Amino acid sequence: MTLFADTLKKYLETKNTTIYTISKISGVNRTMIQHMKVGKRMPANAADVSAIAKAMMLNPSETADLLRAYHISHMGEENYFRRENVSKIISSFYDMNAASELIIPTGMQDNLEMCEPLKAINGKANINRILKAILEIEANKKTGHIKIMVQPEYTYLFDCLTSIDFNRNQTLVEAIIVFDKNEGHKSTTYNLNILQKLVPILFQCEVFHPYYVYDNVDTLFNNTSMLPFKIITSDYVLAVSYEQDKAVLYNSPDMVVLTSDTFQKKFSVANPICHTFHPTPEEYLQASFMSDDEIQAEEVYELFYQPCFPSFCPENILMDRLNTAIIPKEMQQVIAAYFAKIRAQYSNHFISFTLEGLNLFMETGRVTEIPDFMYTYLKPQQRLILLKNIITSVDDGSFKPRIVRSDKLSVPSPLCICAPNEQKVIIYYFSPNKGQYIFHLQELSLVHAFHDFLVYLPESSMVYSEEESKKLLHSIYDKYTNIYC
């Protein structure tokens, strides 16, 4: 029996109706519904599930439950939960725009007085106070270095990394995090949750460098583990229990050396989770340009807030809008040649984008994937030319658009995700407060999860169909033609 069959059977038994009545109202074949109930068949699509739910008079919560069971049974638990978690990570980038200012370390370290080399601490509040104090002490040093061996379960530590200003003195913060090596959706979900916890820190703490090793997470970290979380500074070692209610603070040079050696041994076999940086204009162009092999790949999957407008931009408009004060003439020619290559291969690119992003471009001329300082917003007539070029490419079959349903997937305005192949995923993000960021995912389970999501997206219910997307593009073109002409 599938989860969908079990869920359908549950509602059939609790609702005062018959399969015959449900079939008549929903239009779904009665025999098909009977086969669904015993797990022999699956609905042809989500629309049939919604029709059955309506016929059974399920409330919104029950309808969502039945649809969720359908999607899990249709695509498999691991695929469902992996894709659900990737969509949550994508949507969570919204929170970055509201990131608060960092706190400059204060004199809280004055509360940390130790005469003995070690001190047992009980209670979360006391441990949190000590943790914050030793982090602030290190952040106030000119050559501070913090080494961390923790998991995302230690929420308060992760909160400290997004609130204390470690950037001021360039305090190096290195973290080793265990990724679950087991197969199945629980491990995949756990590893994706790690990335979701790290994203805010990577935005706020420029000196934070997370690394991963593979192991069995449940075995290493549980309520019987002996103080598994370690925070090491120049002067202190704080060892904390899994439940974060017991800890030992060491104020001993020998203990600092011992635990630092242990950290270093793990560090020698660890790898970066991702490479994150603020690019200069040259770095941005280098990072955003795909190689010839990537451009010519059989399939390239991308998710943008807007369509990839530069690829549909005639050279005369491109040169008119580029900021020539900061982009040398030879680089301008390189940019024009690059986008000409992209245009020639666009039939192999599967791009999903939002209606909101398209409307923003048509109203303002802003291209969110390009930093504002690199160009001048496009004029109304130039916007119409680009949209017309997109429509022409859609009509002749050289471009396959998919417009995202914003009620199904939230895509932040400055976000671009590109997967030129199964081994490479790059996330571009522009923060109004922090500027341009580039996230180059390194850990393979994360790379595979994002690549799988981008491949799945164009055929999912999170986007309009190709025909619906075409109609929307034509209607937007007609709307703004009437406004600007």
Regions found by a protein language model. Name each.
Residues E13, K24, K54:
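Alpha-helical residues within the helix-turn-helix
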Residues P117-E466, L473:
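Hydrophobic protein-protein interaction segments
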Residues G27-A44, A51-K54, R68-H71:
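Recognition helix of helix-turn-helix/homeodomain-like DNA-binding domains
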Residues L8, I22-S23, I33-M36:
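Conserved hydrophobic/aromatic packing and binding residues within compact polymer-binding modules
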